[in-house]
């Protein structure tokens, strides 16, 4: 019908592709994503989100239709920004709480898709805890992390990082590190090792390669240094050092979700 009405061939193809789970052309993908995100945002805002087994408007299918093509085409796409922009075009108000619900719903479908691809539950959840708003990036992170957890030396890599996280995660304050307060050799060595690999990693491989380099210094630090020192400033300085290491995983993966953490 589109061709008969005088539309260009690529436009006609895109119109047909918007109903496919994974459109093959860029125009078809753009149309499909816009349609599916608009449906999700509008219906959630209207209070018509799926409940239990009931999904009369096919929103679970729509969410899968958002994440699957982005993964298969490996397209960098910010779902949070897309939902925010779509919310502004709706005839009814879409507040921040509803937008969060939409993103959590899509994340749930993304989790299903990744597990159906054969990835382990804990690996998927570790990644989605930090970067569920970008399906293609999430899929690549899950792929990378899946390789790491199968390594022979994983049993020494994960515990080293876990020690840093466990002792700092309940701290309500982020402490700065004052090099002048570093007194023990092992804490100085750990600080120097961290400085040598300074810079926030951008993916799983970069992050865990840093942890590998830090692991010997981390283990020596915990073996020789009393983190909870009586001197408040020294204690907070040491906690700050470990917080810096723990924060390396921010935006990449929450390793506390992994088996054996």
Name the predicted role of every residue range.
Residues 1-261:
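Amphipathic alpha-helical "coupling" segments that flank catalytic cores
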């Amino acid at each position: 019908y589109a061709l008969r009405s005088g539309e260009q061939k690529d436009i006609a193809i895109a119109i047909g592709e918007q109903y496919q789970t994974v459109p093959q052309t860029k125009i078809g993908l753009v149309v499909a994503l816009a349609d599916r995100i608009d449906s999700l945002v509008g219906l959630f805002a209207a209070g018509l989100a799926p409940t239990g087994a009931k999904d009369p408007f096919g929103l679970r299918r729509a969410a899968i239709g958002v994440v699957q093509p982005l993964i298969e085409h490996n397209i960098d796409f910010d779902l949070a920004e897309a939902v925010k922009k779509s919310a502004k075009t709706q005839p009814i108000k879409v507040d921040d709480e509803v937008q969060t619900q939409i993103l959590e719903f899509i994340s749930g479908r993304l989790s299903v898709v990744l597990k159906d691809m054969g990835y382990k539950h804990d690996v998927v959840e570790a990644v989605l805890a930090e970067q569920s708003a970008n399906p293609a990036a999430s899929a690549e992170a899950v792929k990378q992390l899946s390789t790491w957890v199968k390594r022979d030396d994983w049993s020494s890599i994960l515990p080293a990082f876990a020690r840093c996280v466990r002792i700092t995660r309940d701290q309500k304050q982020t402490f700065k590190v004052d090099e002048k307060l570093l007194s023990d050799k092992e804490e100085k060595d750990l600080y120097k090792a961290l400085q040598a690999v300074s810079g926030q990693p951008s993916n799983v491989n970069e992050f865990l390669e840093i942890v590998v380099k830090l692991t010997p210094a981390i283990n020596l630090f915990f073996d020789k240094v009393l983190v909870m020192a009586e001197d408040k400033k020294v204690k907070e300085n040491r906690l700050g050092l470990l917080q810096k290491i723990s924060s390396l995983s921010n935006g990449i993966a929450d390793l506390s979700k992994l088996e054996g953490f």
